[in-house]
Design a protein with these regions (language model features):
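N-terminal intrinsically disordered, cationic/polar leader segments
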Residues: 1-46, 52-132
Length: 132
């Protein structure tokens, strides 16, 4: 696997605690919260809530596959990743996590943009990353 590694120094900035309302997409909504607060890059500190259905991506490169998880009421167990909006025309947001379906079966992968709508609400905390 050929992977680029970037090491940078920086510090944490503002903390945003956000509530996503029903039928809002996880990735798009968190990106919008960053834009509302003038944040170009943020890390995910924590997320709780549920999704109507979930859609995760697994694998790497040409060997990726979609993992649909049927709801309603798919529980979010963990979310981690980074929101990068420095290139406004092409956001680079990668959020990964673990969810559980209505039977308690767990699934892990990268959340797919536009395919993970909040069920009731989702609460998330985002922390700004400022490069030195």
């Amino acid at each position: 696997m050929d992977t680029d590694v970037v090491v940078e120094s920086g510090h944490y900035g503002r903390l945003v605690v956000a509530r996503l309302k029903p039928n809002e997409d996880l990735i798009e909504s968190l990106e919008n919260k960053c834009l509302e607060h003038g944040i170009g890059r943020a890390i995910i500190r924590g997320v709780v809530g549920s999704l109507i259905d979930a859609s995760l991506e697994r694998g790497y490169g040409n060997t990726t596959c979609e993992q649909p998880i049927s709801g309603p009421g798919v529980e979010i167990l963990s979310v981690f990743g980074e929101i990068d909006l420095r290139d406004r025309g092409s956001p680079n947001t990668v959020l990964s996590g673990v969810v559980a379906d209505t039977k308690g079966q767990m699934f892990a992968g990268r959340f797919r943009r536009g395919a993970n709508l909040s069920f009731i609400t989702i609460e998330a905390s985002l922390q700004e990353w400022i490069s030195d």
